[in-house]
Amino acid sequence: MKVGIMVKIERFEGYSTMVEELEGMKFIINLPVYWKIDEDSMKNEKWNLPVKLLEKVVALIKEGRLRPEEGEIFEKENGETLVYGTKLTGFILLKPVLQGIDGDSLQIIPLYKEEISFARRMGWRRLRNMFKYLTPEELSFISPDRYNIITDIDGRRNCL
């Protein structure tokens, strides 16, 4: 199902935010300054991950397969990845990390299969608590190669 969405881009000091509104809720994805958001770049798979995620969220909600509430997790079937070239297999909806975002917003945070498995075994709140080991930038900004809080233990952050 192809869903047409109207993404709003808000620019802040140090980052940009893509916002899609549905059913009175804002779904947001924060992007680092270097992220290319011009029309030509959005045609490139490397840069259109945020738009694809927003389209997926809207489609899943309209299909009744995802509730627009904190803690909702989506995982692609059969180990498929969200986008070619990444190991991200799903996402979670959480209250926004950055200050100044209103209460009717949910942030889309892409997840690795190990993080999804952890959330299903231990609960999404435990996963959210694990995110404290990431810097605000690592968690807040979308990144196809983000640190995996379950498998990537580097001594600086002893997650488990």
Task: Tell me what each language-model feature is.
Residues 1-13, 22, 27-160:
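Acidic, proline/glycine-rich low-complexity IDRs
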